[in-house]
């Protein structure tokens, strides 16, 4: 987490991974 600016898509994927 923290690189959502450089990897916005990864931030969204993280939400699915956590959920």
UniProtKB/Swiss-Prot annotation:
It is an enzyme of class 3 (hydrolase). It comes from the Eukaryota. GO terms for biological process: proteolysis. Glycans are attached at residue 4. It is found in: Secreted, Extracellular space. Coiled coil: none annotated. The keyword GTP-binding does not apply. GO terms for molecular function: aspartic-type endopeptidase activity. Keywords: Aspartyl protease, Glycoprotein, Hydrolase, Protease, Secreted. On the 2D-gel the determined pI of this protein is: 6, its MW is: 71 kDa. Belongs to the peptidase A1 family. This is Pregnancy-associated glycoprotein 71G. It comes from Bison bonasus.
């Amino acid at each position: 987490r923290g690189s959502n600016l450089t990897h916005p898509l990864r931030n969204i994927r993280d939400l699915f991974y956590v959920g």
